Amino acid sequence: MGALDDKIAIVTGTSRGVGVGIAHELLRAGATVIGCSRSRLDALPGTDAEPDWAQRSAQMTCDQGDYRAIDAMVAEVAATYGRIDILVNNAGGTVPTPNVEDVPVLVQKIQGAPRSDDDYERTVLFHSFAIQMNLISPLWFAIRVCRQMRNQDGTGSIINISSGAGHPAGSPTLVSYGAAKAGLNHLTRSLAEEWGPRVRVNCLALGPTMTDNFRSFVLPKDDPDGAQYFRDVPLKRAGEPAEVGRACVFLCSGAADFINGTTIEIDGGMLPGVLYEAGLKTITDLL
């Protein structure tokens, strides 16, 4: 028996990285998992790892910058599976910038924000996109899924994936992203107060997590294993996507039935703000 047997879960941002790690741990705990991403994929990545995962999973395409696409996706999942028990708002992310005013063309391209040759317009589009994807889109998803959860038997669980960049200490090089994640932390508490007792809302604030993007855009080129980068992290390493996934399993399970409106830091005891100088060096080297 798994902790999440017979549960239907949506996980956003499952084309790679943390989203895939979360999806796999929910599958391991017995849930049926519907992943989604902007990229069109035939299946949730890695579901050939276990014999029954492919049967208990699906991958959908969804432009999370379009509330109509979110509405259509949630409606399709509810119609296909009959209910939605879990939402993990994982999609998001950004790329560090040398400063808030200077958004190089390469950074904009990597992030996937709308393009512009005008310096000011490019900066505005970059920061607007970061706030949209890391705060507004998770709110849209939560509202739509909550409506479904309230119209079915039982209770639901929503988990927002935030970041240490949202800590009040500030996050230079990640200004709009950090502001959006701080907003997501506050949103979590507010929604928990509004939507209880039928729907619980919690948040995981991630520290450094070892994904391909983290290796490419955060770890300094002269420190590929992170030995120096992680010197100020008490556990001396990055987290793994599977560790984030196991925290999600706990928050979605009956073991967390009385946990609501909280933000749990998954960061190895990292002190706020200590890693941003290294991140700035990395993006400066990249440019």
At which residue positions do the language-model features occur?
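Catalytic loop of short-chain dehydrogenase/reductase
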Residues: 93-94, 106-126, 150-151, 159-183, ...
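Conserved glycine-rich cofactor-binding loop
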Residues: 15-17
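Conserved glycine-rich Rossmann-like NAD(P)H-binding loop of the short-chain dehydrogenase/reductase
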Residues: 29-45
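A glycine/serine/threonine-rich, flexible loop-to-helix segment
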Residues: 44-52, 101-109, 206-233, 273-287
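A conserved structural motif in NAD(P)-dependent oxidoreductases
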Residues: 233-244
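Short C-terminal tail/terminal secondary-structure segment
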Residues: 94, 249, 260-287
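Short, small/polar-rich loop/turn modules that mediate ligand/substrate recognition or access, typified
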Residues: 196-200, 259-261
